Design a protein with these regions (language model features):
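Acetyl-CoA-dependent GNAT
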Residues: 3, 7-11, 21-99, 106-111, ...
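Alpha-helix N-cap/helix-start and coil->helix boundary motif
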Residues: 10-13, 132-133
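Short, charge-rich amphipathic segments
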Residues: 101-103, 125
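Hydrophobic pocket/interface hotspot
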Residues: 16, 20
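C-terminal "cap" of GNAT-fold acetyltransferases
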Residues: 87, 122-136, 141-169
Length: 169
């Protein structure tokens, strides 16, 4: 059972959104209250991705991972949110919860870095939730390091600190 990576199409986006919400609940429930993760629903997250894709598809790329023809993960890359043309932003890697530890996240990360390289980027950045220790370890094993920058994101009603990580591509 091998993983296949391909560029997402508009037909993938509702399923990507449902996967995204399942991944968020599984990954964040150890440090965020259930009410913060109750919304959006899987369906609403699907429509969020359909809408987001319409205004970001020209400068972002979503890659989906499939195992035996079934969607099991995705990555989303785009330009740096601070405006540095030499830097790419890894917006997201999300997996079906049962897919963790099977190499899919690493395959998506490697593909995202290759995409940035192909687009002329020399540096990559991402934001990771400070409380998400497994994700932080995953990125650190992949060569990412904290930059010292912090910000807060509102997830549901919970203010959630994020840390910026960077690495060369």
């Amino acid at each position: 059972m091998t993983i296949t990576l391909r560029h997402a199409t508009v037909d993938d986006l509702r399923a990507v959104g449902a996967l995204h919400q399942r991944s968020r609940v599984a990954a964040y429930s150890s440090f965020l209250p259930a009410e913060a993760l109750a919304d959006p629903t899987e369906e609403a997250m699907g429509w969020y991705w359909v809408e987001r894709w319409t205004w970001e598809r020209d400068d972002h790329l979503m890659t989906v991972a499939e195992r035996d023809g079934r969607l099991v993960g995705f990555s989303y890359v785009g330009p740096d949110d601070a405006g540095d043309p030499a830097t790419g932003l890894l917006n997201a890697i999300h997996l079906e919860p049962a897919e963790r530890g099977r190499g899919t996240g690493r395959a998506l990360m490697d593909d995202a870095l290759a995409t940035m390289r192909d687009r002329g980027r020399t540096r990559a950045v991402l934001w990771v939730l400070a409380g998400n220790a497994p994700a932080r370890r995953f990125y650190e094993r992949g060569g990412w390091r904290p930059t010292g920058e912090r910000r807060e994101e509102l997830i549901g009603t919970a203010r959630t600190p994020q840390l910026r990580y960077a690495r060369e591509v």
